[in-house]
Each structure stands twice: as C-alpha cells, then as structure tokens.
C-alpha cells in the first residue's frame, strides 16, 4: 500500500508540474502575442525628441493598450528617409521629415494619401568655446560670413542631396547675398565645393565634391555635431533645436535669411535649389516638419495611435522640453484619418501647393 501511495503522489506531482508548464507556456505565448514593433524613418534632427516620445508612448501603450511596443527607429537625412521607401522599397509605418514638402512631392499618392505639418525650426550657426574666433563670433555675430571665410577656419553643413538642413544651409548663404549685398555664396560655397548658382537658382550635383579641407559635408546635420564637439570642426549650420539639445554655443541669423519667419515666405522664395539626386527643384521657405503614416504600414492601426500621441499634449510637451516649437494647431492635408481630425486643422490642397 505504501508503494501505491508513493506512486499516486508522484503521479499527482507530475500532473501539477505539467499543468504549470502548460499554463506558463500559454502565458508566455499570450505575452509574446502582445509584443509589436513600429518602424519609423525620421529626420536626424528629430532623434532626441522622438526618442523621448517613443519612450513615453511605450509606457502609455503598455498601460492603456495592453501592448509592449518596440521601435525600429532609423534617423537619416529626410530625403534619404523618403528614398528608403520610394527607391529601396523598404517597409515602414511612419515617415517624419524636416521638410514637409518631401511627403507630397515624393510619397503622395503612391505611398500615402495624407500628411501633417507639426513643428518648426530655424537655421543657426553653432560652435563651441574652442572654435577659432569664438569670442569674436559671439561679440559680433553680424560678421559671421567674414569669420567663416578666413583661411584658418573650418565649417560644415549636411549634404543637400540627402538632407533638408543641407539644402537649407546653402539657400541661407544665397539669401545672405541678397540681404547683405555681398558675394557670400560664392565665397563660402562655390570656392569650396562644386555646388554652384546661376543668379538665385542653386544647383547641387548628385556627387558633392569639396575642394579643400576647410569645409566638411556629411549625410545628415547631426553627423557634424560630434566633429564640432571634439574640436575637429569650428562651425556648422544646424537647426536651433539641435544646437540647444547639445548645449552648443550658437548665433542666430537675421529673419530675412534664417528660414524661420512665415511672414517672409515670399522673400525666401526668391531662392531655389535643384538637387542632382532627385532632379527636383525646391524653393526656400519657412522650416516646417511633416509626418505621415504609409498606406502599406505593417502596423497601421498602432501607427495611427502613435501619430495621435505625437499630435496631442504629450507630443507638444516632449518637443517643448527639447527646444523645438510645435505648430498650434498642426495642419493636415489629404485623406486625413478620422482618429486625428480632432487634433489638427484640416485644409484642402490648392492648385500648385506641394
């Protein structure tokens, strides 16, 4: 009888253990089913605010949606972010660019049917205390183009073919010609690179070449940040938000050239640039960021939830904390999803509008 009792006990223990394993496996399966990924291609200048926003959204989704959300996050120049979709045919849920016009020009109608304008910025010249003539630059910011033209000074901007900050930087220097009445573009750009201008129309060859070691060009604007911080580069053209996020010194430029002032849109529009990489011509205009969810987004429903989060109070808070101005309200065009209509001003596209 004792043997029978021991055998019965062993069988019961085995049954309990097996049930526990099955239950645990089932729970693990359910947990894994609740894990999901959002793929985001975004401008380099959005890296810090998007990192904060994604962390906030992950916590929100786990608490309110019962989902563990991971982000496959790729920062690049905005032109490259778009071309990952159009040229490389890569899948993504969300594309966010530093120039909203890239979305209607390159993604509508084949890849998306709506877009939202949500944030602004301005071009500044950033540096550190170790940059050559830093004290003079701070004391006399109006001499910025004279300081950059000195033979012992190095400066940089991002590749116009890959990054809006790059084509905006060279357009700023062409606008400076008009504002100051001096050949600043020729001195700073044409003498140092193969980028050239015919009047106020700038041409950026597909393969950008530099003619000396005074100028540095990188795929996206944030690639230059480390060079300035390490002392390898004296100055660079960058967005104000990025300069502040990295605690860099910087000078602001007149509103006539910094691409910040919406009331000066017509003045900015005197200058345009043709990109060798795409063949497209872009007019200078106030800096406005854009975002969209792609038609074939692998996780479209959740991507719309993230977009709602970005455009809501949480997104505004994160952007303000990272020194970037948010449009109030954001402006949406196209076939705007019902879920975000309460957070945006919906406008109709007009003839000739990008």
UniProtKB/Swiss-Prot annotation:
Q: Which GO terms describe its biological process?
A: molybdate ion transport
Q: Record's Pfam families?
A: SBP_bac_11
Q: Where is the signal peptide?
A: 1-23
Q: Where does molybdate bind?
A: 44-45, 78, 163-165, 221, 239
Topology versus the membrane: Peripheral membrane protein
Q: Which GO terms describe its molecular function?
A: metal ion binding; molybdate ion binding; tungstate binding
Main localisation, per the record?
Answer: membrane
Q: Please give the Gene3D superfamilies that the UniProt record associates with this protein.
A: Periplasmic binding protein-like II
Q: Where in the cell is it found?
A: Cell membrane
InterPro entries in UniProt = ABC_trnspt_W-bd_WtpA (IPR022498), ModA/WtpA (IPR050682)
Q: Name one GO cellular component term.
A: plasma membrane
Q: Which UniProt keywords apply?
A: Cell membrane, Membrane, Metal-binding, Molybdenum, Signal, Transport
Q: Which residues bind tungstate?
A: 44-45, 78, 163-165, 221, 239
Assembly information from the UniProt record:
The complex is composed of two ATP-binding proteins (WtpC), two transmembrane proteins (WtpB) and a solute-binding protein (WtpA).
Cited function = Part of the ABC transporter complex WtpABC involved in molybdate/tungstate import. Binds tungstate and molybdate.
Family membership, please give it.
Belongs to the bacterial solute-binding protein 1 family. WtpA subfamily.
Q: What is this protein called?
A: Molybdate/tungstate-binding protein WtpA
Q: Which organism is it from?
A: Thermococcus kodakarensis (strain ATCC BAA-918 / JCM 12380 / KOD1) (Pyrococcus kodakaraensis (strain KOD1))
Query: What lineage does the source organism belong to?
Result: Archaea, Methanobacteriati, Methanobacteriota, Thermococci, Thermococcales
The gene from which this protein is expressed is wtpA
């Amino acid at each position: 009888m004792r043997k029978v009792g021991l055998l019965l006990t062993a069988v019961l223990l085995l049954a309990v253990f097996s049930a526990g394993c099955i239950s645990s496996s089932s729970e693990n399966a359910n947990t894994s089913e609740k894990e999901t990924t959002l793929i985001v291609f975004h401008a380099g200048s959005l890296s810090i605010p998007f990192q904060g926003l994604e962390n906030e959204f992950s916590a929100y989704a786990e608490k309110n949606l019962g989902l563990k959300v991971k982000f496959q996050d790729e920062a690049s120049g905005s032109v490259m972010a778009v071309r990952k979709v159009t040229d490389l045919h890569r899948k993504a849920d969300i594309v966010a660019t530093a120039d909203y016009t890239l979305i209607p020009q390159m993604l509508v109608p084949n890849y998306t049917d709506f877009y939202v304008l949500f944030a602004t910025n301005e071009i500044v010249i950033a540096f550190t205390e170790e940059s050559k003539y830093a004290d003079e630059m701070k004391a006399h910011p109006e001499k910025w183009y004279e300081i950059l033209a000195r033979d012992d000074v190095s400066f940089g901007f991002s590749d116009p073919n890959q990054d809006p900050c790059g084509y905006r930087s060279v357009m700023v220097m062409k606008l400076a010609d008009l504002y100051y009445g001096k050949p600043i573009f020729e001195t700073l750009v044409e003498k140092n690179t193969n980028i050239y201008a015919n009047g106020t129309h700038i041409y950026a060859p597909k393969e950008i070449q530099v003619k000396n070691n005074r100028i540095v060009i990188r795929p996206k604007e944030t690639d230059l940040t480390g060079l300035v911080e390490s002392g390898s580069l004296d100055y660079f053209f960058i967005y104000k938000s990025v300069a502040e996020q990295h605690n860099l010194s910087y000078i602001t430029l007149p509103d006539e050239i910094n691409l910040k002032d919406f009331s000066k849109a017509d003045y900015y529009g005197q200058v345009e640039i043709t990109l060798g990489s795409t063949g497209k011509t872009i007019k200078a205009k106030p800096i406005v960021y854009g975002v969209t969810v792609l038609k074939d987004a692998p996780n479209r429903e959740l991507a719309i939830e993230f977009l709602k989060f970005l455009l809501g109070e949480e997104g505004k808070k994160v952007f303000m904390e990272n020194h970037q101005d948010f449009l109030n309200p954001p402006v949406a065009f196209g076939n705007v999803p019902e879920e975000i209509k309460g957070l945006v001003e919906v406008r109709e596209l007009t003839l000739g509008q990008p």
